[in-house]
Amino acid sequence: MTAHSLIDDIRAAAPDLRGRLLENQSLSDLTWFRVGGPAQVLFSPADEEDLAAFLAALDPSVPVTVIGLGSNLIVRDGGIPGVTIRLGGKAFGSVEIDGETIRAGTAVPDMRLAKAAAEASLDGLAFFRGIPGSVGGALRMNAGAHGGETTDVLTEARGIDRNGAVRSFTHAEMGFRYRHSSAPDDVIFTSATFRGRPGDREGIEAEMERVTAAREAAQPIRERTGGSTFKNPKGGKAWQLIDAAGCRGLIRGGAQVSEMHCNFLINRGGATAADIEGLGEEVRRRVREHSGFELHWEIKRIGVESSEG
């Protein structure tokens, strides 16, 4: 099925869609690495109702991929077949606060969530200041930093499943563990509810400043990077294992292991997704041979490899 026929089929099945529907849309500008091929079809729904109608009408055989801010992501050079969904706009990007409860759309950047909580003098969410992703990604991988994790503050998540049905998940139903959630893979999260605790605004903002300073001092945040590349294995720290295996500064094509922080890969300029993923696999191989530790990707890799070359 060609991109043209797929988008025509979608328009025929769901003629009343209000969101933006594009074909053969480049995704490289939507990822922090600035690499990757096109989406066969890219859909940006107008709101939750629009998303539900889209999924209900979509042929079940069409694969669906969801992307957020693109900070923890490698889109392979061959692009993403089927439909790629990206949430954005006011419908998915608002934050509402009622007492100690914070409700945020899943397109809200984690850093903005932390700022909103601080402005409401709600403590417990300052760690989000150190996470360069969105609320949706935080739900999917139990994102955390500086001693805090999503599981510590989430009370409920809401989303749409592949059939277009609205689903709600309690904290227990999310099944959080280290950098993982057991929520069904086909659910596209649309909002989340968090609970903070009353605190001192100045103290919370000071903590956020400390988080920011620590991140800037230790991580290559000015580079084109996807964030932490590998999960910390039990009994070790990824960056130390990578450094001990002699991988600091290692280069493959336009990709490099950061000199500043070994658990970050960077696009030096002109890198392909294959360069970055291939470098990561080489790092995994060297760490395995040097220490016996098996590193597992924290960065999500999606799409198909390029057929060129």
UniProtKB/Swiss-Prot annotation:
Catalytic residues as annotated in Swiss-Prot or TrEMBL: 179, 228 (proton donor), 298
NCBIfam families, per database record: murB, PRK13905.1
PROSITE patterns xrefs: FAD_PCMH
Record-listed E.C. numbers: 1.3.1.98
Purpose of the protein: Cell wall formation.
One GO term (biological process): peptidoglycan biosynthetic process
Protein name (record): UDP-N-acetylenolpyruvoylglucosamine reductase
Gene: murB
GO cellular component, one term: cytosol
Reaction equations catalysed: UDP-N-acetyl-alpha-D-muramate + NADP(+) = UDP-N-acetyl-3-O-(1-carboxyvinyl)-alpha-D-glucosamine + NADPH + H(+)
Record keyword Transit peptide present: no
Keywords: Cell cycle, Cell division, Cell shape, Cell wall biogenesis/degradation, Cytoplasm, FAD, Flavoprotein, NADP, Oxidoreductase, Peptidoglycan synthesis
UniProt source species: Methylorubrum populi (strain ATCC BAA-705 / NCIMB 13946 / BJ001)
Domain of life per record: Bacteria
Functional pathway: Cell wall biogenesis; peptidoglycan biosynthesis
MF (Gene Ontology): FAD binding; UDP-N-acetylmuramate dehydrogenase activity
Essential cofactor(s): FAD
Transmembrane segments: none
Family listed: Belongs to the MurB family.
